[in-house]
């Protein structure tokens, strides 16, 4: 855009890189180089010498697409500018490098040979040169910023115009679409209402027909249910009578078996108890006889002593002692008789208790057997009734399914008949319309 190649405008940025920092090259040593030109390494500029203010360039979408397309082709692109003999500038999309050759230093040697009195360049001359370069660069940067601001203003105005146009187009299209949508919605609502009315009429007719058929089927099912109930009651009464007979027969058999078992047990237990009672009575009787014999022996000894005392005519206190002894012996005899009577009474009581226990055990066993038989009979009855009811339930469910299938088939037939009638009605209406149109045309002609 500009004749000077050093000027870089941010508005013209094909690589989409934005502003770059100026790279300051270090000073070469002042020794006279006799060989070929050496490249100096590039060092990024410090923060003190960052004279450029980074600004983001305003890039339109078209320029972005153009830059993205050119990135692949311009990867290896670089530009070489010879500013002066011995001072070469290389500009790439990422950096700017400067090369100082021998020619620049040879020129200094010539100046020294031509003007030997002046000597070498002083530092003041170098500083003045650098200040001139800095002033030129600041002017370039100011020009770039002005160009950038003007380009940004132009692009913003163009974008505002385009946005306004796009908004207006969008509003117009949106209005047209809304109008078309409202018209379509109104048409669809009208069509839907008409279809709903027709379907409601057809559904009411179907409901009336279905109600009549349902009443008929309900009455038929009730009669069938009553007949099945009567049959089930008859079968149940017969089975009940059979169960009662079987129960009586089984009870009699069980009671006879238990009676035999209990009689055998009672005979065995009574024999053992008789043996025990006889043994106890014999032991008591033997003890009584032994005690009786001992008492008789004592009595005889006492009588002998009395006779001896009578003969000797002892003192009367001895007689009192003997009388007391006889009195004690008689009391013991009376106690023995009482004990025998009590033992006999207790034996009778034990026999009565044993008999009562035996009879109670028999009754308990009978009741247990009756309860067990009743439980078994109830379980068998429950199982049989469950099986019978399951069978009846299965039969009834199958019949219900069959009836539902019949109802569905009849409904389908009715629907087909209604659809055929509607088709015939529509065809007849179309024929009548065509006939009326033909008659009107003939009258007009």
From Swiss-Prot:
Primary location class: cytoplasm
Gene Ontology CC terms: cytoplasm; cytoplasmic vesicle; outer dense fiber; sperm flagellum
Keywords of the record: Acetylation, Cell projection, Cilium, Coiled coil, Cytoplasm, Flagellum
Start and end residues of each stretch annotated as Disordered: 26-47
Ranges annotated as biased composition (Polar residues): 30-39
Keyword Cytoplasm tagged: yes
Coiled coil region boundaries: 122-226, 283-315, 387-414
Subcellular locations according to the entry: Cytoplasm; Cytoplasmic granule; Cell projection, Cilium, Flagellum
Residue list for modification N6-acetyllysine: 376
Protein name: Flagellum-associated coiled-coil domain-containing protein 1
Organism per entry: Homo sapiens
Lineage, top ranks: Eukaryota, Metazoa, Chordata, Craniata, Vertebrata
């Amino acid at each position: 855009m500009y004749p000077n190649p050093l000027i870089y405008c941010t508005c013209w940025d094909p690589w989409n890189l934005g502003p770059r920092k100026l790279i300051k090259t270090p000073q070469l040593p002042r020794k006279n180089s006799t060989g070929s030109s050496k490249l100096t390494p590039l060092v990024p500029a410090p923060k003190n010498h960052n004279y450029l203010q980074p600004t983001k360039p305003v890039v339109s979408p078209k320029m972005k697409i153009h830059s993205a397309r050119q990135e692949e082709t311009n990867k290896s692109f670089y530009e070489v500018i010879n500013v002066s003999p011995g001072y070469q500038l290389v500009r790439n999309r990422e950096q700017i490098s400067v090369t100082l050759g021998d020619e620049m230093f040879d020129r200094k040697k010539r100046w020294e040979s031509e003007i030997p009195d002046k000597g070498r360049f002083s530092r003041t001359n170098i500083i003045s040169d650098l200040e001139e370069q800095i002033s030129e660069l600041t002017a370039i940067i100011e020009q770039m910023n002005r160009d950038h601001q003007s380009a940004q203003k132009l692009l913003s105005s163009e974008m505002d115009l385009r946005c306004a146009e796009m908004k207006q187009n969008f509003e117009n299209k949106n209005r047209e679409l809304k109008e078309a949508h409202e018209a379509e919605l109104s048409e669809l609502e009208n069509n839907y209402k008409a279809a709903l009315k027709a379907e409601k009429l057809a559904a009411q007719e179907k409901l009336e027909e279905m109600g009549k058929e349902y009443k008929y089927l309900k009455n038929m099912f009730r009669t069938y249910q009553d007949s099945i109930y009567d049959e089930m009651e008859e079968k149940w009464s017969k089975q009940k009578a059979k169960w009662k007979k079987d129960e009586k027969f089984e009870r009699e058999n069980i009671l006879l078996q238990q009676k035999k078992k209990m009689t055998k047990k009672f005979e065995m237990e009574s024999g053992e108890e008789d043996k025990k009672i006889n043994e106890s009575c014999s032991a008591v009787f033997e003890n009584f006889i032994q005690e009786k014999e001992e008492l008789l022996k004592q009595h005889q000894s006492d009588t002998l002593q009395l006779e001896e005392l009578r003969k000797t005519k002892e003192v009367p206190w001895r007689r009192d002692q003997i009388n007391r002894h006889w009195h004690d012996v008689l009391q013991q005899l009376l106690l023995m008789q009482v004990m025998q009577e009590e033992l006999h009474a207790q034996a009778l009581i034990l026999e009565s208790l044993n008999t009562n226990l035996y009879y109670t055990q028999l009754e308990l066993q009978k009741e247990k057997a009756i309860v067990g038989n009743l439980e078994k009979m109830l379980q068998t009855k429950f199982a049989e009734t469950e099986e019978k009811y399951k069978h009846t339930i299965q039969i009834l469910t199958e019949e219900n399914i069959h009836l539902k299938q019949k109802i569905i088939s009849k409904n389908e037939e009715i629907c087909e008949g209604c659809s055929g009638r509607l088709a015939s009605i529509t065809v007849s209406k179309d024929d009548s319309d065509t006939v009326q149109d033909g008659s009107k045309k003939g009258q007009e002609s």
